[in-house]
Structure formats: structure tokens, C-alpha cells
Amino acid sequence: MKFDKYKYREDFVFKDNRICLTYQGLRKLYKPKKLTGSRIGGVLGSDSYKTPFQTWCDIMGFFKEDLDPYFLEAGRIIEPKLKEYAELQIGKSFKSYDPPSIKYDLFSSNDVFGGVPDGEEFDANGNIVSILEIKTAQLDKYKWVFKDNQFRLFTEDGKPVVSQTGGGLVKWFKNGEVLIPESYKDQLSLYLYLRGITVGYFCVAFLRNEDYADPHSVKFMSPFNKYLNDGIVSEEGDHILIWKKFEIDLKEFEKKVHVAKQWYEDHVRKAISPPMTSKDLEWFRYGYPDLEH
């Protein structure tokens, strides 16, 4: 992780436990990022991996994260396969978009919210009736190490180490019920809200260690929603696949939208961060060790 865009005291000051960009810093900012589906959870508090302050730093371009390619590359290859398989099994068709061709934003007319849904379903009249959110989740729990101010996969002989077989299922199942993480709900809810519709679908595949090692060879053959109370499938070699309908109340979610929009106005437009927690301060000092108390 690198903090190399802004210089302390020249581009920002630390005051009242907040970061404030100076005029020089604002010139470097140019254009802040928008609140996408993957960022809104950090603002609303539903993302267990990012605090509001870290989300602000992301939007303002404070750091560059070294993303681990192991899971990302597998997801890039496998998600289109999963979408195609789901369409055949469920009997629906979803239009997907090429992010670079639309500048990674399907909602360019909105100056606060943006992003690219995984797929949109259209009716015969060309109206969007539902939105698809695809997730490739880890079946197993892996060993991680904290290095360079971020968590990285621990490897032996160039291969990730599994710390608990099937451990990735814990946050997804409880008493036989599928638990969609709140940050994912907020992600899909935002896209539904921006389209003015109420129905979406989660399509989730739990990938095995061998799937990540050879993503091009992955084939889906299991029926959706075939699992026991703990999420384990009954036949060896099957993938655990989830298809779950998701509906929102537009007026109810609008309350969250107003909160997020006000947060954006208060902190991004004004270039003043949310207050730091003690962990935020420790995290930020990795890039700016001379930051004063």
C-alpha cells in the first residue's frame, strides 16, 4: 500500500482528529471518486473491512492498494461462466456491461453515486425489471498476514494456505438460512434505487482451492440452493450455488441514500475527512509516520 499522492502539511493538515485538504491538495484531487455499490457500505457502516475514514481516503485517492491477484483473477474468469450457467438454470437473461467501454460507470449523469451492476434484466418493452449481483465466495478460510498496511495471502511454495476447510461458509449460513452480508445488500440496493426498481437477485458460488488454482477449468453442474444446514453439499465435487431473490422498499432505502449523500457533501465536497478512530490513525500513519498528535 502506498500513500504517495498527497504531502503532509503541503496538501493536507491534521486537525481535530480529521484530515483537511489545503488549496494545494485540492488542486491535486482533480476529481474525487463516486460512491459505488462497493463503497457505500463503508459509509453506512455495513462494510466490516472498511471504515468511513478509509472509504474517504479511497474516494480522495490517498492510497494505492496492492490487490492480490489470486482471487481477483479467478473471479474475473469465473463470474461470466457463473452468469451464463445461472441464466440457463433459472431461465432469465441479464445484460452485462464492459466496464472500460462505459468508463466504469453506468450512472454517469449522477454526480454522487455510480458503478456497474453485474447484469440487468429487461422486459419485452425494454424496461429494466431486475438487477443481478454475482459473488464468487471462498469455500475455505485462508491464512492471511498483515504486511505493508494491508492483509495479504500467506503462501507456501507459491501457493495460498488453507487454514480451515469450509471455513468460508460461516458468514453465509445460520440455522439453514442463507445470510447475505449487509454490505452486499447495500450494494445491490443502491443499484436498484438508482434504476427505480425493487427486485434483484444474488447469484453466489463458493469456490474451492482447486478452482482458484485453475479457474479456466471450472465448470458448474450443481443445482442452485442444494445444501444442508451448514452449507455443505451432499455430493462430493459439487459446487455450493446460491440463487436468492432480493427486494427493497425504495422509500425505506432512500433514507440510507440521503445519509450517504449528506456524508459525501460534508466530507468529499468540503474535503474534510470523517473523524478517525484509533485504528484509522494507526492505519494512516503507515503512510505519514510524522503525523502529529
Regions found by a protein language model. Name each.
Residues M1-H293:
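Accessory terminal regions of nucleic-acid processing enzymes
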